[in-house]
Swiss-Prot record:
This is Imidazolonepropionase. The keyword Ubl conjugation does not apply. Its EC number is 3.5.2.7. The lineage of its organism: Bacteria, Pseudomonadati, Pseudomonadota, Gammaproteobacteria, Enterobacterales. The gene is hutI. Its main location: cytoplasm. Zn(2+) binds at H75, H77, H245, D320.
Length: 415
């Protein structure tokens, strides 16, 4: 293969590439002693090091370090006001969630704090969290609303997300989660709140270009199937993709409903059954595992991993970063947890934070793979093997982070 190189191209030389490309017949799509050629914001070519002659363009010798696609976190609640650490302490001291809620705690505490926070306050706190994700190699992240629960404050949250996307070297997928829970003012009339979402919040914020998918908490303590379907029908009228928090605490059938609307993903899924798994297999919907919430809530029922494998359902892994049930801004830790708690293999976990996570956000195949034509979003690690990245926690093996072809975190010297 002959490549005509330009002076502005960049060659990342002598690498171990975990491409995650299904066309590469090896675990992790691993290629040893290969060069990665970047032109502008995309990968131009991947070739054996010996096959590519040095030209006048920039050459960066990574000295057999591991290069992977940039990590993708496909489920976070990154923007919120307040802090729930005191509530966690109270729970650890024996107070029940019902008692905390009666005192104004729980999700309503976050809603109140978020409503009381200014744009600037929310931007500052969210920026600190986002910086932590980027420092671990995340190049694409999903961020949900869901702590405003009225038009004004859901718009405020999504405007903060938009601001973060405009001022950081990371791709952000914004999701409308107005159907997170009923706000206090609609506590006894959830159908009326769903009216507000479907008739006002969703269409107005969609027309302002503030989100790209709709999510819902479909659960016995959230919204029922009929209410969830009303939301999906409203989204369908605007051709908006849907996804759902489903089967976390009980089996309600939410996964099958998401699949019926060809949803992007079903998330949590501890109580998913075989009928639900089969529906996901037919629709191509991604199963997103959230081990941080499983750990923090001390759950005991794991998602049906063997069934997902049996029916070839793509599995993604995410942090579910949020203040109440998963306050962990580390996708590497979620990867470790997914292996230890759920029994995923390291390769399944890597697929879950690259190719399958990209699919869960409607971004395959230009994200989550190292291949010609994909975006040049990748990470150089001080490591030899993919499993090294999340085996040992407590220090960060990231050497260089590249977003759209540009180094954003680096300790490599050009050679």
């Amino acid at each position: 293969m002959v490549i005509e190189l330009r002076d502005t191209d960049i060659i990342w030389r002598n690498a171990r590439l975990a491409t995650m490309d299904p066309a590469v017949n090896a675990a992790y799509g691993l290629l040893k002693e290969y060069d990665l050629v970047v032109r502008d914001d995309k990968i131009l070519a991947i070739l054996p090091t010996a096959a590519l002659q040095t030209s006048r363009c920039q050459v960066i010798d990574v000295q057999q370090r591991l290069i992977t696609p940039g990590l993708i976190d496909c489920h976070t609640h990154l923007v919120f006001g307040g802090n729930r650490a005191y509530e966690w302490e109270q729970r650890l001291n024996g107070m029940s969630y019902a008692e905390l809620s009666a005192q104004g705690g729980g999700i309503n505490a976050t809603v109140s704090a978020t409503r009381a926070s200014s744009h600037e306050q929310l931007e500052r706190s969210a920026q600190q969290r986002l910086t932590a994700f980027m420092a671990e190699g995340v190049t694409t992240i999903e961020i949900k609303s869901g702590y405003g629960l009225n038009l004004e404050n859901e718009e405020k949250l999504l405007q903060v997300v938009q601001h973060l996307a405009q001022h950081n070297p990371i791709e952000i997928s914004p999701t409308l989660l107005a159907a997170h829970t009923c706000p206090p003012e609609y506590k006894h009339n959830p159908d009326a709140y769903m009216d507000l979402i479907c008739e006002d919040i969703l269409p107005q914020l969609w027309q302002k270009g503030l989100f790209e998918a709709v999510d819902v908490f479909c659960e016995s303590v959230g919204f029922n199937l009929a209410q969830t379907e009303r939301l999906f029908q409203a989204a369908q009228r605007w051709n908006i993709p849907v996804k759902g928090h489903v089967e976390q605490l009980s089996h309600l059938g939410g996964s099958e409903l998401v699949a019926r609307y060809h949803g992007l993903s079903v998330d949590h899924i501890e109580y998913l059954d075989q009928a639900g798994v089969e529906s996901l297999s037919h629709s191509g919907t991604v199963a997103v595992l959230l081990p941080g919430a499983f750990y923090f809530l001390q759950e005991t029922r794991c998602p049906p991993i063997d069934l997902l494998r049996q029916f070839n359902v793509p599995i993604a892994v995410s942090t579910d970063f949020n203040p109440g049930t998963s306050p962990f801004a580390s996708l590497r830790m979620a990867m470790n947890m997914a292996c230890v708690q759920f029994g995923l293999t390291p390769e399944e976990v890597w697929l879950g934070v690259t190719r399958h996570a990209a699919r869960a956000l409607g971004r395959e195949p230009r994200h989550g793979q190292l291949r010609a034509g994909a975006y040049a979003d990748f990470v150089v690690w001080d490591a030899e093997n993919p499993v090294d990245i999340f085996y040992e926690l407590g220090h960060n093996p990231l050497n260089t982070r590249v977003f759209r072809g540009v180094m954003t975190h680096s300790s490599i010297y050009n050679r």
